[in-house]
């Protein structure tokens, strides 16, 4: 596995390619179009795009023709006109009886009917919205609203490998939820709620291996990456093991873990933690995984250059395993990190100090 990963990392393209990313902001009405040259390692701001609102989370549709975003009380969609320009198409106020909650996360179905799933966070419970799209992929209407019950606080969503299950990571409710997805309408129906293995684990984000046999879950409060096995017949989740996202002996109360993503080749997993104090760094880690998705080993646990603020959100590249993007909201920047075989290092930093940057990033190409 290590030799395969090293080969992937050290193989370089023949010619330089400019890759494009979009970056969201927590507190300012801006989206940022960024370019990364994979040979010169230059990271540049291509466009500072004024938007309808600040956007806490951004995600692309299956064709990369639309960008979907969250705001305090709404969902929005932007048409991608060029790799560095966006056109606002639609904003929908979130629906549901979730007082004090804010729109926090979106996930899009990659097959017909291409519905978009959103969840709110905060207040006394979370609400979920199922959103239809129009012929151009823009958000159209909220076709279903549901809630997760008192005490819930869902912060992350993932769609199963067969596109028939919606998994929800319930940070406040210390559990994972499972809903079936109707293949005709895209609407969901409750199936199960699975408690975390220990009190105060607080599942924050979740991602599913393409073969559908494993789920990777960030435990925000205990600062661990948890591995769940999935029964491919029943889709039942079973906790199996976990790995630390802060050094052993460090107090969990000083950290809050954040994001998890599979690499492009699915040969390893990236995960991050944030520090609650500006004078402590967050951490970035990678894990070698088997062909079936089981976690084999933790490759490294490396401090990030800042606490990460509310971000330290990792975004894997869509063109290879060598690079990932990392955003920071303490100082307001995006970085590109390179995997070197047994460790990782920063190769480019772009300051976007715009009184609100940066939330998460997505690679357009």
What are these regions, as identified by a protein language model?
Residues 16-42:
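An edge-strand/N-cap motif at the start of beta-rich repeat modules
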Residues 33-41, 77-86, 130-139, 179-187, ...:
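Short loop/turn segments immediately following beta-strands, especially the blade-tip
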Residues 21, 67, 116, 166, ...:
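Hydrophobic beta-strand positions that form the internal "hydrophobic ladder"
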Residues 51-63, 95-112, 147-164, 196-214, ...:
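Beta-rich, blade/repeat-based domains predominating
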Residues 43-50, 87-95, 138-147, 188-195, ...:
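Beta-propeller fold detector
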Residues 329-335, 340, 345-365:
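Blade-level signature of beta-propeller repeat domains, shared across WD40, Kelch, NHL, RCC1
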Residues 26, 70-72, 119-123, 171-172, ...:
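Short loop/turn segments immediately following the C-termini of beta-strands
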Residues 1-18:
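Fungal secretory targeting signals
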């Amino acid at each position: 596995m290590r030799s395969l990963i090293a080969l992937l990392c050290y193989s370089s393209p023949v010619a330089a390619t400019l890759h494009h990313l979009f970056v969201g902001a927590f507190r300012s009405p801006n989206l940022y179009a960024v370019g990364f040259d994979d040979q010169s390692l230059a990271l540049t701001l291509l466009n500072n795009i004024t938007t309808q609102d600040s956007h806490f989370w951004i995600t692309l549709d299956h064709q990369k023709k639309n960008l979907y975003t969250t705001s305090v009380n709404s969902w929005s969609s932007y048409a991608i006109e060029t790799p560095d320009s966006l056109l606002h198409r639609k904003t929908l106020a979130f629906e549901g009886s979730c007082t004090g909650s804010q729109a926090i996360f979106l996930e899009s179905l990659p097959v017909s009917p291409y519905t978009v799933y959103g969840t709110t966070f905060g207040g006394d419970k979370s609400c979920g919205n199922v959103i239809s799209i129009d012929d151009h992929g823009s958000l159209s209407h909220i076709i279903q609203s549901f809630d997760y019950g008192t005490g819930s606080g869902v912060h992350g969503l993932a769609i199963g490998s067969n596109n028939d299950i919606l998994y929800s990571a319930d940070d406040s409710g210390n559990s994972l939820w499972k809903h079936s997805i109707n293949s005709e309408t895209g609407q969901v129906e409750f199936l199960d709620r699975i408690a975390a293995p220990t009190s105060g684990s607080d599942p924050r984000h979740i991602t599913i291996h393409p073969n559908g046999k494993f789920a990777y879950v960030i435990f925000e409060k205990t600062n661990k990456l948890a591995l769940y096995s999935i029964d491919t017949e029943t889709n039942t989740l079973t906790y199996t093991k976990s790995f630390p996202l802060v050094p052993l002996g460090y107090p969990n109360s000083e950290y809050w873990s954040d994001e998890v993503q599979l690499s492009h080749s699915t040969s390893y997993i990236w995960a991050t933690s944030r520090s609650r104090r500006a004078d402590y760094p967050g951490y970035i880690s990678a894990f070698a995984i088997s062909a079936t998705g089981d976690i084999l080993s933790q490759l490294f646990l490396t401090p990030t250059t800042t606490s990460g603020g509310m971000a330290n959100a990792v975004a894997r590249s869509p063109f290879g395993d060598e690079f990932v993007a990392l955003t920071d909201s303490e100082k307001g920047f995006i970085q590109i990190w390179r995997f070197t075989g047994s460790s990782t290092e920063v190769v480019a930093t772009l300051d976007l100090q715009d009184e609100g940057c940066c939330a998460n990033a997505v690679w357009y190409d």
